[in-house]
Design a protein with these regions (language model features):
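Signature of the SF2 helicase/ATPase Hel1-core->accessory helical subdomain module
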Residues: 180-256
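An active-site-proximal beta-strand-loop segment
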Residues: 325-338
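Conserved P-loop
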Residues: 80-82, 87-133
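Conserved small/polar residues in nucleotide/adenosyl-binding loops
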Residues: 345-353
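Conserved nucleotide-state-sensing and coupling region of NTP-binding domains
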Residues: 111-170
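N-terminal accessory segments
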Residues: 1-75
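Conserved RecA-like ASCE ATPase "motif II neighborhood" in helicase/translocase motors
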Residues: 151-195
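ATPase catalytic-site recognition across NTP-hydrolyzing enzymes
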Residues: 261-327
Length: 355
């Protein structure tokens, strides 16, 4: 018999009143431990605030990253993940509330591709902080008396929350945490299919606006679905690899279907439903939005199954050899190296063309 069983056996032998008092004290102790866990462990907080929450493997990954941001261990985080996988619920609703519960004096700037959406997040966070179950976890934390606007409010400890859409002005605002949630709209992505330059305006706004509003030691969280190699994730990663001293990012990619052919979130998205969705979408959209790979080989002009192998010393007979060079011009540690592609126009290919 283990210690718990021994204790419960002893309690069961006590008079009814004493037994009820002890059980009541034990329940209070368990509740106190649960509240403390909710303050320090993000996923525990999520389950307490959202009892019907269906946990998946990716939620543990996201929670670990958010905890490291809150603890000051991670300053630049990008999470790329598919639609309808609780991206916004975690990053733009539950995390800001939990963070301000822990650090009610901090400042958050929340962005989304429209001001309406960003303000909607602010309203949900504000309402959650006002709820009794939140107050039980973070007693003494509330909104200031004059905090009525959904997208602009303060805590009673002089913390600040400010919500804006992409392109909005952030002059005069500072952020200990900047959260960017899906900065690109579907309409923008549709235009981007024909004119990739449309993605540049988001990157230019990010660098000229929100990025400059970060407090010393502040953190940036970007959660988004991929659309293009020119989207915000793509341009930030490119900058990080090409510019000396640029921000260094931790990038978490969460594809809807894993390399093992298992769904990322089988508890909510069964494989057959994802495969049906894949069959209905253009390859480029599925690869980018659901697999977080806007350069997936399925959408490439040259496909993997076309490649053939031969022994190094015995290449096939060829009619011509073509070389294409991509040279590196930057002399920095992060500069891309020079690369060469050598193409052989083989005799059998020439024979097929001739006849």
């Amino acid at each position: 018999m283990n210690n718990t069983a021994l204790v419960m056996n002893k309690i069961s032998q006590l008079p009814v009143q004493q037994r009820q008092e002890i059980i009541g004290l034990l329940e209070e102790l368990e509740e106190a431990k649960a509240k403390e866990s909710s303050r320090t462990d993000f996923i525990t907080f999520v389950k307490r605030m959202w009892p019907s929450f269906i946990a998946g493997r990716h939620h543990s990954i996201m929670s670990d990253a958010f905890e490291r941001v809150a603890n000051g261990e991670l300053k630049r985080l990008i999470i790329n993940m598919p639609p309808r996988h609780t991206k916004s619920e975690f990053a733009s609703y539950l995390f800001p509330a939990w963070f301000l519960g822990r650090y009610p004096e901090k400042k958050i700037i929340q962005t989304a591709h429209t001001a309406e959406l960003a303000v909607g997040f602010g309203r949900k966070v504000r309402n959650l902080i006002n709820q009794e179950d939140f107050q039980e976890v973070f007693p003494g934390i509330s909104l200031s008396a004059d905090s009525k606007a959904a997208g602009r409010w303060n805590t009673n400890k002089k913390g600040d929350y400010f919500a804006i859409g992409v392109g909005g002005a952030v002059t005069g605002k500072g952020a200990d945490v900047l959260i960017i949630d899906d900065p690109h709209s579907e309409q923008e992505a549709a235009l981007g299919a024909y004119n990739p330059d449309v993605y540049d305006k988001v990157y230019e706004w990010y660098t000229s606006g929100p990025r400059q509003r970060l407090q010393p030691g502040g953190a940036i969280i970007i959660v988004m679905t991929r659309w293009s190699t020119r989207d915000l994730t793509g341009q930030i990663i490119k900058s990080a690899t090409q510019r000396e001293g640029a921000d260094e990012w931790e990038v978490i990619e969460l594809p809807a279907i894993l390399p093992s052919e298992e769904p990322l979130w089988p508890e909510f998205w069964p494989l057959d439903q994802l495969q049906a969705l894949k069959a209905e979408l253009p390859v480029s959209k599925w690869s980018a939005q659901y697999q977080q790979d806007p350069t997936a080989e399925e959408g490439a002009l040259i496909k993997r199954e076309w490649w053939q192998e031969w022994e190094y010393d015995s290449p096939p007979p060829c009619e011509a050899i073509i070389q294409s060079w991509d040279t590196a011009f930057l002399k920095t540690q992060r500069a891309d190296y020079s690369a060469c592609t050598c193409l052989l126009y083989t005799s059998d290919a020439a024979d097929e063309e001739r006849g």
